[in-house]
Amino acid sequence: MTNNPLIPQSKLPQLGTTIFTQMSALAQQHQAINLSQGFPDFDGPRYLQERLAYHVAQGANQYAPMTGVQALREAIAQKTERLYGYQPDVDSNITVTAGATEALYAAITALVRNGDEVICFDPSYDSYAPAIALSGGIVKRMALQPPHFRVDWQKFAALLSERTRLVILNTPHNPSATVWQQTDFAALWQAIAGHEIFVISDEVYEHINFSQQGHASVLAHPQLRERAVAVSSFGKTYHMTGWKVGYCVAPAPISAEIRKVHQYLTFSVNTPAQLALADMLRAEPEHYLALPDFYRQKRDILVNALNESRLEILPCEGTCFLLVDYSAVSTMDDVEFCQWLTREHGVAAIPLSVFCADPFPHKLIRLCFAKKESTLLAAAERLRQL
């Protein structure tokens, strides 16, 4: 018998600490302005905080129902009908989760079997691929090209096979800041209608959409929503990322499978937070209705402040992120450039290549503008010096 520690064989040997954690740590080390990780430097609504304190004081501190507090699921159903013309069933279609990340993981785990192929659009959020791998799935990536990152539907159709089980899309899209229109959902339906393929629509930034047409949701498409999971996040909507409360909307047969996973991941979600969110949704719908203008102003502050810089600004149709091309500044790759930018100029950003599996030849970085005006102006002043 030896004293050597027993080391498990990794199921995810290629993964280390996420770039978001790395860049935030580097920003803290160098006291840099952190435009890397997508969290605000301002607080959420006072009313929401007051309702949380109220429900805690009232003793709502025990387990919530596994599917979510009834009042919150009812408020979600009402909001969904108001925005997308579809009212999901409160009992069978809506599941409250520990953040959108849990909803994504539970949905992927419920739908993907060993050997199934899952189509993702690169650049893509980094939580998709590990969840697919843990379920034995195979990621099939379709690269979207800057500056507009639109889907080539002929190339998409060519990716489909008898093994395709799932398509994961994200709109508004992190990190490219582009949005889908209803024409995109129509094209998706045309491509998969004859196949047994499910859809996960990651819509955590649904309320941060600057398109004149407003947010296009999979839930507004009658055929697609019968085989789709829509995922959303209260943390993004109410500037409370630390609360980690999200939800998913799906047809009853899909929801039933998602809940089988959910009940053994977290079982239930923070009770007083759910009750407070239900109160907020009912009492102040103007908050989420005003979010496009709120974040448009922040986007424009940063864009205008960078106009005199050597950074090329890409179109931003949604999310709280802005892509910039630094080709005129440096020949470094994007990871090295972000590290240098944090150390030497005191601004932390995210390299776009980390959202892609294949080599990414473009010199693009992502800036988060979910910040106070003073933070954005201070960061822009440093970036103009490049």
Spans of model-derived segments:
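Conserved core segment of the aminotransferase class I/II
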Residues: 3, 220-221, 225-296, 300, ...
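N-terminal small-domain helix-loop-helix segment of the aminotransferase-like
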Residues: 3-99, 106, 281-283
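Conserved PLP-anchoring active-site segment centered on the Schiff-base-forming lysine
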Residues: 110-132
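A short helix-loop-beta submotif of the ANL/AMP-binding
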Residues: 134-140
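A short helix->loop->beta-strand "cap" motif at the edges of active sites that frequently abuts
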Residues: 137, 194-197, 225-226
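Active-site phosphate-binding strand-loop segment of PLP-dependent enzymes
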Residues: 144-213
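PLP-dependent enzyme catalytic core of the Aspartate aminotransferase-like
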Residues: 157-158, 340-349, 355-386
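Conserved glycine-rich beta-strand-loop-beta hairpin in the small C-terminal domain of fold type I
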Residues: 278, 294-303, 313-326, 360
